[in-house]
Amino acid sequence: MAGTSDRAGKPRMPNAKPSMIVIPCLDEAGHIASVIDRVSSSAERLDMTILVVDGGSRDGTREIVGEMAVSNPRLHLLDNEKKIQSAAVNLAVEKLGGGFESLIRIDAHGDYPDDYCERLVEEADATGADAVVVAMETRGAGVFQRATAVAQNSRLGNGGSAHRLVSKGRWTDHGHHALIRVEPFRAVGGYDESFSHNEDAEFDYRLTEAGYRIWLTEKTHMVYYPRASVTSLFRQYLGYGRGRARNILKHRVVPKGRQMIPLLVAPAVAGTSLALLNWAALLPAGMWAALCLGYGGWIAIRQRDPHGPLAGFSAMVMHLAWSAGFWRELLAFRRRETRA
């Protein structure tokens, strides 16, 4: 394969198994059993351990995992007192990472092809990459969730993000985390546990700055099920915005072009409060709303998808929440700097 790393073809660590599967979770009773079932066959074929790292679930998730572990000796449950996903993966590597070449991170809220783990291991071996990331396709069940999936699969919702639109494998600086070699994971200090959101992008920045390489594969992908209500979607993207701001502030990097436009949304919406003084204050927010709803209508016509119009509204929720979260974190940082 063209463009492979100089790690390609190197022997494995002595006595180390290829990979361990790490599933961070919190209150995922509705999904955890199917996710474990999905990866169990691969775990058997590749001799992998499955670690469910639970952040204190109260909905029966732990009991489900415990019952499944009785008949599945590869399955283990770890307690994650810090609750967040970044801490969950770090804990898994701390406890068992020394016995494995790499970790495969699985989202409890997602779905995966039956050969997902095999393809990741093959790609890591073929390219010599230090991390393999995948494309993410979003699907939904209810009306709002389906509309959100349509939005997230479009440029309106993902801004043309590389790991949303993959036709050919290539080297990249970021993607949806799938496989990471344990050695480089430890070398850069693992995930920053001060990040409750966007820990993957922050990690990828440190990984690539340290000279490690990330391969975006087209050989497999994962399916993600978005939040099913306006409130939960807004809360999620508020966290994403704050995480992105923290990443930029920590590393003093300039936001990418596709991130600059959503940054204007919260100020534009806030500016509508000046409409009593001048009606022109409505124009920026009005143009943004018209663009989103119009794009949703275009999706409905072009793709013959009845969820298109509502997808425009879902995109508005995501844009506004992300922008508000970003500015909230930025202003909080300025206040902390002023006090210091």
Task: Enumerate the predicted regions with their spans.
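Short, acidic, metal-binding catalytic loop of nucleotide-sugar glycosyltransferases
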Residues: 37-47
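A conserved acidic beta->alpha catalytic loop
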Residues: 54-63, 82, 110-113
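Catalytic donor/gating beta->alpha subdomain of glycosyltransferases that bind UDP-sugars
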Residues: 124, 192-255
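Short beta-strand-to-loop acidic/aromatic patch adjacent to the donor-nucleotide binding site
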Residues: 100-111
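Glycine-rich, basic loop-to-helix element that forms the pyrophosphate-binding segment
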Residues: 79-98, 119
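Short, flexible, basic/aromatic active-site loop/helix in glycosyltransferases
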Residues: 134-140, 148-177, 250
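Conserved donor NDP-sugar-binding/catalytic core segment of glycosyltransferases
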Residues: 114-146
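Membrane-embedded multi-pass helical conduit in multi-pass membrane proteins
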Residues: 264-336
